[in-house]
């Protein structure tokens, strides 16, 4: 099995609900290590740049507005098959379709306010991690 890194964001609605510890506990119980983390308030440019691939989609403006509506917690997770494992822990993008016990089923408010972001591939993970973290900020253990 491959040791991978993936990016995770606890979105503004989950930060506001004060469920960061619950979410972190799920990462760790699944065997993922948190090797970098920062809380920040994204501005329009930073959020828009991160979600650049969605710029032409009709939901882009709403997505940027939501992601800038409050602080987010951004972390790098590391472990065996971290990308797929994190996506499994998160659950389906639409919380109505998410399995019981997943982060989105338990903490999302809607499709657009779905509590967490996770990289969808190792390529995306590398790009997304570099967007928010310098190599010196990541501490593999």
Swiss-Prot record:
GO BP of this protein: CTP biosynthetic process; GTP biosynthetic process; UTP biosynthetic process
Catalytic activity field: a 2'-deoxyribonucleoside 5'-diphosphate + ATP = a 2'-deoxyribonucleoside 5'-triphosphate + ADP; a ribonucleoside 5'-diphosphate + ATP = a ribonucleoside 5'-triphosphate + ADP
Keywords: ATP-binding, Cytoplasm, Kinase, Magnesium, Metal-binding, Nucleotide metabolism, Nucleotide-binding, Phosphoprotein, Transferase
Disulfide bonds: none
Localization terms from the record: Cytoplasm
UniProt EC number: 2.7.4.6
SUPFAM superfamilies (alphabetical): Nucleoside diphosphate kinase, NDK
The UniProt record lists the keyword Magnesium: yes
Cofactor dependency: Mg(2+)
Keyword ATP-binding attached: yes
Gene Ontology terms, MF aspect: ATP binding; metal ion binding; nucleoside diphosphate kinase activity
Listed GO CC annotations: cytoplasm
Residues that hold ATP according to the record: 11, 59, 87, 93, 104, 114
One family name in Pfam for this protein: NDK
Residues forming the catalytic site: 117
Primary site of residence: cytoplasm
Family from the record: Belongs to the NDK family.
Role description: Major role in the synthesis of nucleoside triphosphates other than ATP. The ATP gamma phosphate is transferred to the NDP beta phosphate via a ping-pong mechanism, using a phosphorylated active-site intermediate.
Quaternary organization: Homotetramer.
UniProt name for this protein: Nucleoside diphosphate kinase
């Amino acid at each position: 099995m491959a040791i991978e890194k993936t990016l995770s964001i606890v979105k503004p609605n989950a930060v506001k609900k004060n469920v960061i510890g619950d979410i972190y506990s799920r990462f760790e119980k699944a065997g993922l290590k948190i090797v970098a983390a920062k809380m920040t308030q994204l501005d329009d440019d930073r959020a828009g740049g991160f979600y650049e691939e969605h710029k032409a989609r009709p939901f882009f403006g709403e997505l940027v507005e939501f992601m800038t509506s409050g602080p987010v917690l951004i972390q790098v997770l590391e472990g065996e098959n971290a990308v797929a494992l994190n996506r499994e822990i998160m659950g389906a993008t639409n919380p109505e379709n998410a399995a019981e016990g997943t982060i989105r089923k338990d903490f999302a408010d809607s499709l657009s306010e779905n509590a967490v972001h996770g990289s969808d591939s190792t390529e995306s993970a590398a790009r997304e991690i570099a967007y928010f973290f310098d190599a010196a900020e990541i501490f593999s253990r």
